[in-house]
Design a protein with these regions (language model features):
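Amphipathic alpha-helical assembly/interaction segments
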Residues: 1-133
Length: 133
C-alpha cells in the first residue's frame, strides 16, 4: 500500500530541517551562500525529495532504495553543516536548533526503512506517526 508521504512524520521532519537550513543560509554573504550554502540547501532538500519519490514508487524495493538515498543526503547535510560551523557561518543558537532535529531524523529514517514492506496489504503508516496536514 502506498503511503501519503506528506503525512509521515519522517517527511515533515525533513521539511522542517530543510526550511531551517534555507533560512540560515539566506543570511550568509554571497560567497558563503554560493559555496557551502548551495551545497547544504541542496543536500537538505534532497532528504525529503527522496522520501517523497520513494513513496511514489510501486515497489517496496524502490521505496527502500530512495530512503537509503535520503539517509545519504542526511549524512551529506551533516557534513556541510560541520563545514559551515568550522567556517563560523553557524551560530551556537542555530546549532542548538538544528542538532536535535538531525539527531531525531536519522533513527526515524532507519525505522521507516525497516518498516517498508512489512504487513503488506494491511493499512499501515510504515511505522511512522502521521498527521492529517
Amino acid at each position: 500500500m502506498r503511503t501519503n508521504f506528506e503525512n509521515l512524520r519522517v517527511y515533515q521532519l525533513s521539511e522542517e530541517i530543510a526550511d531551517a537550513i534555507w533560512e540560515t543560509a539566506r543570511g550568509w554573504d554571497a560567497f558563503a551562500r554560493n559555496t557551502v550554502g548551495a551545497q547544504v540547501v541542496r543536500s537538505a532538500d534532497s532528504i525529503g525529495a527522496n522520501i517523497a519519490e520513494g513513496a511514489g514508487r510501486g515497489a517496496c524495493a524502490d521505496n527502500r532504495r530512495f530512503v537509503r538515498n535520503a539517509r545519504g543526503s542526511l549524512n551529506e547535510t551533516k557534513h556541510w553543516l560541520r563545514r559551515a560551523y568550522r567556517r563560523r557561518l553557524l551560530t551556537e543558537q542555530t546549532v542548538a536548533k538544528l542538532k536535535p532535529l538531525l539527531d531525531e531524523l536519522g533513527p526515524k529514517l532507519n525505522n521507516y526503512l525497516k518498516s517498508i514492506g512489512r504487513a503488506a496489504g494491511a493499512a499501515s503508516d510504515n511505522g511512522q506517526q502521521t498527521t492529517n496536514n
